[in-house]
């Protein structure tokens, strides 16, 4: 996501990260990242990542227009998708090499936190699926940043707790962000 943030900053886009896997502009989703992995304690069988970037979409239907945007809608300019992909791949490659060298995200925490849309804002944590939420599966807290493992650090009742993406869905108090 920081790679996308870097590409966005080069295009003069005011993008932010919605932990754990979305990039937003002005409160609307412009990019999503999906991952799937099969692993054991000491062995990864496979990892698959998919990235979708709304590049030149000119409009969204009624159900998405308040939640999604594109580079074109945000800048008024069409983007060359091949150049966008190349810029992202180049930025991602640098971040990935550093991650592999360090073995964790320590080198990126400060930069990520600067791009975090919900930093120092109240968030709602849904433990499980949002649509199945019951009061005992909902927590509220203040997003404080991420740790070296990529967990969102959420302050709940004065105590900071790391929250992993597989456990929750994060929503801002005002809605999606």
Language model: regions and residue ranges:
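Single conserved hydrophobic/aromatic residue that forms the stacking wall/gate
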Residues: 1-13
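Short, acidic (Asp/Glu-rich) active-site segment that either coordinates a divalent metal cofactor
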Residues: 42-73
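Short, mixed charged/polar active-site loops
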Residues: 29-32, 134-140, 160
């Amino acid at each position: 996501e920081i790679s996308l943030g870097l590409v966005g900053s080069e295009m003069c886009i005011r993008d932010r990260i919605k932990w754990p896997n979305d990039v937003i502009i002005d409160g609307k989703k412009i990019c999503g990242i999906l991952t799937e992995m099969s692993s054991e304690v000491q062995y990864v069988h496979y990892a698959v990542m998919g990235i979708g970037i709304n590049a030149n979409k000119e409009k969204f239907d009624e159900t998405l227009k308040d939640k999604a945007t594109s580079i074109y809608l945000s800048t008024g300019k069409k983007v060359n998708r091949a150049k966008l992909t190349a810029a992202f791949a180049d930025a991602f490659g640098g971040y990935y090499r550093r991650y592999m060298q360090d073995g964790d995200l320590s080198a990126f925490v400060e930069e990520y936190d600067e791009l975090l849309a919900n930093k120092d804002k109240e968030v709602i944590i849904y433990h499980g699926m949002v649509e199945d939420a019951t009061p005992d599966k909902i927590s509220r807290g203040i997003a404080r940043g991420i740790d070296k493992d990529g967990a969102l650090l959420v302050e709940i009742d004065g105590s900071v707790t790391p929250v992993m993406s597989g456990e929750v869905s994060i929503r801002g108090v005002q809605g999606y962000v």
